[in-house]
Amino acid sequence: MVGKAHHELLKEQHDIEIYDPALGYKHLKTPDAVIVCVSTPPRKDGACEMKNVFDVIETTPDVPILIKSTISVEGWDMLVDAFPNRMLNFSPEFLRAASAVEDLQNTDSILVGGSDPSFWGKVFNLPVEIAEVHELILAKYARNSFLALKVAFFNQMYDLCDALDVEYSAVAHYTTMDERIGDSHSFITEERGFGGHCFPKDINALVKTAQRNNVELSILKETVEYNRRIRKS
């Protein structure tokens, strides 16, 4: 999704070379820069698996690298330690799965942190807001975790409405009339809770990062457990 969206955005401005061994694209020729959009699946303990990102960087020439994959704070620190002389940058993506290409094409600026953010403004031909990488990583996780929390909250409101024989759709409508809340992620589906690729992975990775730093994200932990229960039922 992320790789395809960036390909569509940049193909008119640059010669794009795809590197994806799983799809048969096994060799990089002489790129001027590399954008990393590989998956970072959860490990068994919920932490972010960095192997795919490491594999790409290890096979990439010494050129500027922009990581668009979702990575953890500790994952970034591992990369910096492993590749101290490489031109590493990170830029979070906030694309929706159903409209990733359109979302990226409508972007009017990019957030970048790392060794040379201004370079990537020239690549994308967009203004760059420069930030510290850890801030960007946590912001990415915070957005998805908050939306997962919102899904769980409205699912619990649905349960309460059901128990009281109250029409949930009316309650949700009157609640989300408040512009501060909005109606996104308030619709209840037959599957219940949140699934997909990003929300479960990212909320668990954020909880794991917090645990490693002796911080208890109790609200998010309960969200994960509640979601697990209703997804099984």
Q: For each of these PLM feature ranges, what is it?
A:
Residues 1-10, 198, 225-233:
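Glycine-rich adenosine-cofactor-binding loop
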Residues 1-30:
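NAD(P)+-binding Rossmann beta1-loop-alpha1 motif at the extreme N-terminus of oxidoreductases
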Residues 12-13, 77-91, 95-183, 209-216, ...:
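Internal alpha-helical scaffold of NAD(P)-dependent oxidoreductase catalytic cores
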Residues 27-28, 102-105, 186-191:
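Solvent-exposed alpha-helices and their adjacent loops that cap or buttress functional pockets
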Residues 29-31, 62, 106-107:
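Alpha-helix C-terminal capping/helix-to-coil transition sites in glycosyltransferase folds
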Residues 34-35:
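N-terminal Rossmann-like NAD(P) cofactor-binding module of classical short-chain dehydrogenase/reductase
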Residues 40-99:
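Rossmann-like NAD(P)(H) cofactor-binding subdomain of soluble oxidoreductases
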